């Protein structure tokens, strides 16, 4: 049996100094020899998805103590992508993923913790902690803060708006027909409670994926932050982590370790879920990164393969008026996985931290299986409270009925899928030989084939300027380059450009392609993650204004219609220039911290992880 890692600092004469310090934190003789459980919290007053997490660490800690473990809590940073959006703050978002992963690794290894509970929620925090868990490979349970309630419907300028969210507010700000009073009405309704933004954006997508990976408990991705039912998830996480720690250290059961739970089959399941639910394109970036951290065989080719055979079964905001509370009412992640299981598109022989196999989990938690437990039925009745609040567990409202409509409800079956192929696709071509990502769940099928002239800009700020300056016309392809992991640096999200296109009435008439990335709130013909990026010598850096760009989803291609000989001439000219593969006229402050990230960052097809010599 493997010894407790913490014995290094709790057992033997040589550990006297460390034990003295442990005692100063409150430990006693009876604690030495028990598994020390690190609780990685991410509470901050900057982020609505984390503002309510201040006390939940103690809920987990109490459960750990009761189960026979020794809890020790610490905190990571957390960047709010929405607040950082549209200015220099967004340069720090993706690099913060690496800082979070490093900080968790540092704390856990420096203090020889035996197990880990990750209390995450928003965009880069769950991926950062996931990367750390895959690196550390010690017993780990994820429990997130939960989704925000959707904003309530409002009337703006005589037009009824569907339940609102962050994207509604951003799009309205670019719509000149919306008055200041109307915009204020939308803004005040859009984000009514604590929790991760209410649509199938990056945060909620990743929290759903941790369920599919087997590292989080049932309901983790969809139970609202405000609902009393979520408290039980934190309590159970504390019990489960001690159980799996004991199975590893006392029974030599390696099946509970993250790399054996979230193995190659589990990553395939997670991506099948992502494709089926039309998740954020950022999930591609983050799953690729996590797989690399865990040395799991999972790459962009695997994602492409999955996207070709898994149908799109659910469309949630920003792609419909459904929000996470509606996904929950329809049975949450187990219901989507259940439909994939019935379609033969799931590996059910993988394990989870809470149930021996995925097969057994879905038998008792899929509300459409006919065998769902009373616990599952009870959980998925949890409904929004409809009250503005930053308090977790503050409502106990219940839906009067569940949404089990597989033909036209929030979650459909394969026979009634939105599209035969999934909501995310990998495109390739001369402009993206190493791949690019498109969220097809966010566009109409009549846009699956598109061609138009390039309008080239070399920063997100310039993109916003040309859109708001009415320089983009129907049929144009806006090319935003030098916004990749190294070129940005930091691979900014292009939420403002896409939201402003939508607000200007161009969301279905133009395309936007970039070596940057998109918010989970992005919709429209928005292609990101173009690899190689411009700063790494990618062809996107050679595109000129007026070049014809062709997009064809059916053939999975993205091309600039310029002869190879012409591209070769442009490349030679670029290489001979004074500042090759750099933006010509961009005013941007790049700090030492960002330059350090840029020096090591890989392109998006590698997950934008750091390449360390």
From Swiss-Prot:
InterPro entries: Dihydro-acid_dehy_C, DihydroxyA_deHydtase, DiOHA_6PGluconate_deHydtase_CS, ILV_EDD_C, ILV_EDD_N, IlvD/EDD_N
Keywords: 2Fe-2S, Amino-acid biosynthesis, Branched-chain amino acid biosynthesis, Iron, Iron-sulfur, Lyase, Magnesium, Metal-binding
Binding site for Mg(2+): 81, 123-124, 493
Pathway the protein takes part in: Amino-acid biosynthesis; L-isoleucine biosynthesis; L-isoleucine from 2-oxobutanoate: step 3/4; Amino-acid biosynthesis; L-valine biosynthesis; L-valine from pyruvate: step 3/4
Cofactor: [2Fe-2S] cluster; Mg(2+)
Assembly description: Homodimer.
Protein name: Dihydroxy-acid dehydratase 3
